[in-house]
C-alpha cells in the first residue's frame, strides 16, 4: 500500500476571529469525504485555542508555525512545545524558509526545534529547500543534504522517520520563476534517496510535501508525481474552496 496523502495549510501571519471561524467551518464541511489524506492547518499562535475549539472532534488536525528550541525559561516572546501540546497541536512547522531567511534560523537551530517538538510528542513538518542563487550555482542537493543531515545528526534517523518533510523551492516563491512538476519530483526523489542512505524503510515511508505555491489548478498534476505525497499550502490555504480542492486532489 502506498503512502497516505498529507496536506498542511500554513496561514502565516493572517486571520481574524471572524474569518477563522468561517474558514475552519468550511474546511471541515468540505473535506468530510476525504479518504487516506491527513488535513492539517497551522495557524498563528493567538488563534490556536480558537482553532482547537472549532476542530476538536473533527477529522481536521491543527498545529503551530514555529516552536522554541527551549521547553521553558526566560525567553520572552517564545512559545514552547509544551504550550503547543497543551492546546492539542499534533504538528508544528520547523525550518520554514521565511524563518531561515528573515529570522536567521540556521540548520542547527532548526534541528534543535525539531527535537524539542518531538520530545513533547508533536510531529515536526521539516522544511528544506534552496534559494535562487543556490539553485543557479547547482547547489540544490548539497544545501538540502546539509539541512537533512543537521536533523539526522542531532536527533537520529529514526526521529526523522517520525516527521513529515516539506520541500520549498525558495527560488520559485515570489521570483516570477516556476518549478515544474518534474523539477519538484526530481528534488523529492533526491530527498528520498538521501534518507535511504541511512534507512531504506524510512525513505520509502516518509511523507514528503511540496511547498512551492500549490494551488487548486496545479495540485493534481503535482500530486501524481511518485515522490510527492501532498503539499504545504500557503496563500491557497486562506481560501476555503482552494484548500478543499487541494485536499481532495491529494486522495489520488
Swiss-Prot record:
SUPFAM superfamilies: Triosephosphate isomerase (TIM)
MF-aspect GO terms: triose-phosphate isomerase activity
Enzyme Commission identifier(s): 5.3.1.1
Any single biological process term in GO: glyceraldehyde-3-phosphate biosynthetic process
Cellular location(s): Cytoplasm
Listed transmembrane segments: none
Reaction catalysed by this enzyme: D-glyceraldehyde 3-phosphate = dihydroxyacetone phosphate
Keywords from the UniProt entry: Cytoplasm, Gluconeogenesis, Glycolysis, Isomerase
Similarity comment: family membership: Belongs to the triosephosphate isomerase family.
Subunit (UniProt): Homodimer.
Family matches, as HAMAP family: TIM_B (MF_00147_B)
Protein name per the record: Triosephosphate isomerase
Species annotation: Nitrosomonas europaea (strain ATCC 19718 / CIP 103999 / KCTC 2705 / NBRC 14298)
Classification of source organism: Bacteria, Pseudomonadati, Pseudomonadota, Betaproteobacteria, Nitrosomonadales
